[in-house]
């Protein structure tokens, strides 16, 4: 199995994402929080449709069983608000061969009605056992996270209900088998 290096630059969107209060509150509830404000990780919800569209358009969807969500760098420019419709676009910004497989980074960008930046995410996917056809390519810089200087000690345990994955999937509106199967 291969991923062609020439997928760099492929785009999807912009696609509209209508943010409603029910969605904001449901996402918070799935994480055990009670709030009407957008959770810091809520952007994954409105980015999901454009993410899927981009994977289909670039031929990556056929390799989903090999995909590991390996990296996630989210910049929040401002919080999304209930009642607004964002425009979400995605673009593949880099590909590289790594020892375990091909590594692909897509950049998701959400903008408000006035064109103002709401969030930017570099979403890194490792395709295990897949080879990159062609050289490493990048049209935008997407940095690896810094390495920890020391191993982090455990801080405790968190009980996770057997139904948590299903609740999260429904409340996030991210219907992805990785959460539930």
Which residue ranges define each predicted feature?
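Hot-dog-fold acyl-thioester-processing enzymes
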Residues: 1-69, 132, 136-140, 147-181
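HotDog/MaoC-like acyl-thioester-processing domains
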Residues: 1-10, 71-160
């Amino acid at each position: 199995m291969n991923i062609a290096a020439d997928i760099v630059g492929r785009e999807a969107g912009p696609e509209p994402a209508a943010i409603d209060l029910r969605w904001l509150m449901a996402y918070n509830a799935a994480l055990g929080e009670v709030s009407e404000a957008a959770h810091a990780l809520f952007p994954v919800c409105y980015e999901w449709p454009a993410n899927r569209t981009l994977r289909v358009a670039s031929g990556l969807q056929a390799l989903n069983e090999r995909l590991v969500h390996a990296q996630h760098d989210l910049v929040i420019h401002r919080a999304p608000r209930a009642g607004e419709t964002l425009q979400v676009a995605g673009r593949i910004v880099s590909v590289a061969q790594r020892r375990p497989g091909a590594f692909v980074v897509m950049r998701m960008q959400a903008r408000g009605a006035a064109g103002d930046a709401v969030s930017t995410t570099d979403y890194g996917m490792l395709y295990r056992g897949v080879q990159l056809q062609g050289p490493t390519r990048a049209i935008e810089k997407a940095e690896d996270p810094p390495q920890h200087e020391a191993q982090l000690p455990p801080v405790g345990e968190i009980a996770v209900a057997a139904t948590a994955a299903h609740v999260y999937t429904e409340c996030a509106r991210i219907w992805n088998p990785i959460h539930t199967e």
